Swiss-Prot record:
This is 1-(5-phosphoribosyl)-5-[(5-phosphoribosylamino)methylideneamino] imidazole-4-carboxamide isomerase. Pfam families: His_biosynth. GO terms for biological process: L-histidine biosynthetic process; L-tryptophan biosynthetic process. CDD domains: HisA.
Amino acid sequence: MIIPAIDLIDGQVVRLYQGDYDKQTTFDLSPLAQLKSYQDQGAKLLHIVDLTGAKDPNQRQIKLISELVAGLDVDIQVGGGIRSEQQVTELLAIGVKRVVIGSLAVKEPELVKSWLNKYGSDAICLALDVNINANGEKIVAVSGWQSAGGKTLESLVAEFERPGSKQTALKHALVTDISRDGTLTGANTALYTELAAAYPTILWQASGGIATLDDVSAVKDSKAAGIIIGKALLINQFTVEEAIQCWPNA
């Protein structure tokens, strides 16, 4: 599935290079008009990242997100700075389909597991943003990528993937190779192939580095369930319509 994405800072559409707030590109675009364009080209799910909220949860752009959700007809998933159940319920109440949880899944996995139980596996998506070190270990970053979480991707997934009898299993997870994010250097398809094979019950969303339609096809072949595309669409590398031709929506 093709999942067009926009990142927002203070109401503006932006892109960061490798998650670095000091390497920001701002686009002179209306967030709603851009998302509507993606919707009109056939996207069935849109991804919004509140980067202001990721950096400072007290500054979350909830009013803007509410306006965007109200102005669109397709499913929306939202991430960035989700730190409390109140924020989860707030997003679900305004019509967000799925809340994307990053840092908190590393810091307080039991809390996030309780949300899976309460709201269901379709309402929660884990965002696992990884730095892959020289030993090939996938270390999960936290707090808008401003610090390392200290856990490996595998150890974190194991906490959610092997639930007890009363635990709702994880269904959706988004994985970004930070070294590829915003770089247009191609996706880390080996990573997604490995994850899809190791954890076949999880619907993996691939993110980071998508530059060409060949990249889209390569991620499709990796058996990921979906692909997040941000910068490539903003700079007109290709269109949503063209991407969907490579990877028709299920």
